[in-house]
């Protein structure tokens, strides 16, 4: 029976781009997937047909061959076809790939491939980063099939030796004066074929699922730090080792504190009376409030260090410090009495010409005067 056109199977024009091919495949694969149509042989056949069409059209070389020769490019027994040596699952990037690499190196039977590593982005608060915490996360992943235990075969059966390569995982092809060694197109280098696949995973040995993990965040982590959980990534194909899971940390912005390394910074407003006369204030830390002594004549922007109130180093457990930057606040919403008092205070400063009370201002304006005097000379 004549095979249906691959473009018609996916419902796309022959001029379709890669994006259109992927979109059409995703839509049809979800509709006819065996997990959604259990026991429906028609849907199962349709799914295989869709998958075959996608694998050909998404590959540039295979698509080019199909456009030139049609289904004959992938069928055995066509002596006039360039591709007659290979079965439907042939990979043309293998056939026309690094020929000399195959001559001198040669492919070997494929080993079971380790599962892919996964990455999970986790947001935590500054308090959680400083003190450490345990969190549960749920991740989508491929896990080893519990029915076949990753073998991909139905219960009570085993994979059989590939008849094309006789279990070697590789075949030899004549290329003029050379014999080229290639990965077997039937078993894809495995050396075995699953003739009776598992009903649950359909021979893949893995199933899509979600799993919940408890992740311990040690004290001291910062944004862009990563935690590695061994063997918690995707399950490997054909029973191979699982990949790893990397938890990428992002620390949320805090309303009071900023972090630089193991030190914490915060701004503390004080009124100009305390700045001038000194006093004692309470400042926040991540462990509660502590008292901070403000000396007289404190200038705005001065840093005060409170030792041991920062972040513990994740490497050596040394504790950072808290640095408080005081900001002298200009009073607002003054009543008449307060304004009169400030005028009186200001007049007293003027009487001293600011030399004693505002030495910084005096230095600045003296510098400005010298600057303009030099310009007029």
UniProtKB/Swiss-Prot annotation:
Homodimer. The keyword Secreted does not apply. The gene is dnaJ. GO terms for biological process: chaperone cofactor-dependent protein refolding; DNA replication; protein refolding; response to heat. A zinc finger (CR-type) spans 132-210. It holds the Pfam family DnaJ_C. This is Chaperone protein DnaJ. GO terms for molecular function: ATP binding; heat shock protein binding; unfolded protein binding; zinc ion binding. It comes from Buchnera aphidicola subsp. Acyrthosiphon pisum (strain Tuc7). Zn(2+) 1 binds at residues 145, 148, 198, 201. Residues 5-70 form the J domain. SUPFAM superfamilies: Chaperone J-domain (SSF46565), DnaJ/Hsp40 cysteine-rich domain (SSF57938), HSP40/DnaJ peptide-binding domain (SSF49493). Belongs to the DnaJ family. The lineage of its organism: Bacteria, Pseudomonadati, Pseudomonadota, Gammaproteobacteria, Enterobacterales. The J domain is necessary and sufficient to stimulate DnaK ATPase activity. Zinc center 1 plays an important role in the autonomous, DnaK-independent chaperone activity of DnaJ. Zinc center 2 is essential for interaction with DnaK and for DnaJ activity. Participates actively in the response to hyperosmotic and heat shock by preventing the aggregation of stress-denatured proteins and by disaggregating proteins, also in an autonomous, DnaK-independent fashion. Unfolded proteins bind initially to DnaJ; upon interaction with the DnaJ-bound protein, DnaK hydrolyzes its bound ATP, resulting in the formation of a stable complex. GrpE releases ADP from DnaK; ATP binding to DnaK triggers the release of the substrate protein, thus completing the reaction cycle. It comes from the Bacteria. Its main location: cytoplasm. It is found in: Cytoplasm.
């Amino acid at each position: 029976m004549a095979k249906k056109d691959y473009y018609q199977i996916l419902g796309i024009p022959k001029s379709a781009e890669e994006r259109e091919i992927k979109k059409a495949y995703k839509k049809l694969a979800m509709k006819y997937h065996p997990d959604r149509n259990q026991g429906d042989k028609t849907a199962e056949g349709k799914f295989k047909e869709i998958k075959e069409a996608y694998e050909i059209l998404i590959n540039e070389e295979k698509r080019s061959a199909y456009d030139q020769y049609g289904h004959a490019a992938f069928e055995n027994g066509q002596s006039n076809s360039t591709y007659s040596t290979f079965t439907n699952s042939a990979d043309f990037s293998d056939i026309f790939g690094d020929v000399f690499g195959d001559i001198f190196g040669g492919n070997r039977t494929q080993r079971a491939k380790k599962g892919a590593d996964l990455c999970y982005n986790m947001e935590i608060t500054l308090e959680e980063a400083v003190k450490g915490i345990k969190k549960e996360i749920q991740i989508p992943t491929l896990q080893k099939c519990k029915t076949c235990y990753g073998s991909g075969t139905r219960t009570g059966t085993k994979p059989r030796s590939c008849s094309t390569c006789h279990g070697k995982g590789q075949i030899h092809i004549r290329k003029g004066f050379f014999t080229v060694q290639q990965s077997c197109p039937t078993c894809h280098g495995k050396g075995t074929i699953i003739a009776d696949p598992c009903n649950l995973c359909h021979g893949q040995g893995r199933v899509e699922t979600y799993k919940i993990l408890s992740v311990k965040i040690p004290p001291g982590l910062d944004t862009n730090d990563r935690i590695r959980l061994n063997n918690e990534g995707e399950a490997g194909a054909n029973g191979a080792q699982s990949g790893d899971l990397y938890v990428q940390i992002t620390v949320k912005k805090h309303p009071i504190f900023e972090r630089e390394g193991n030190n914490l910074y915060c701004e503390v407003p004080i009124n100009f009376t305390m700045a001038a006369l000194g006093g004692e204030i309470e400042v926040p830390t991540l462990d509660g409030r502590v008292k901070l002594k403000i000396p007289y004549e404190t200038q705005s922007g001065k840093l005060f260090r409170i030792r041991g109130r920062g972040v513990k180093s994740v490497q050596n457990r040394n504790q950072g410090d808290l640095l408080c930057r005081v900001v002298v606040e200009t009073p607002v919403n003054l009543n008449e009495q307060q304004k009169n008092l400030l005028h009186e205070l200001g007049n007293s400063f003027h009487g001293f010409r600011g030399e004693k009370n505002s030495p910084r201002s005096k230095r600045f304006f003296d510098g400005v005067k010298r600057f303009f005097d030099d310009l007029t000379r």
